[in-house]
């Protein structure tokens, strides 16, 4: 009998992304181009919604054609300066990284990120004390 449960030895990066409650690894990428994600600060509950592509297309020195390679998605924590400051302050393990949805095209990924930003009211949502609920709000 074989098990499909991932063991700690199969997880090759710190604070792994979770997708539907399970750790997401390179083996899970398949035909997906990218994903929409939520990062939650476990100390303050402040969140960030964004998107990331699994693949980077770069032209190596001396070459004419772009080559496809896996991006830095495992280490990625968003592009927001305020979020980056809090990562330094609290440490990466104080943040939960969740994949909201997976997409097979760049266009689907971009569309779903925008849709999530609107349905979650990231520009206007605030906590009871008036603090923005999302890092995206600034």
Where are these regions (language model features)?
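Structure-specific nucleic-acid interaction/processing domains
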Residues: 2-138
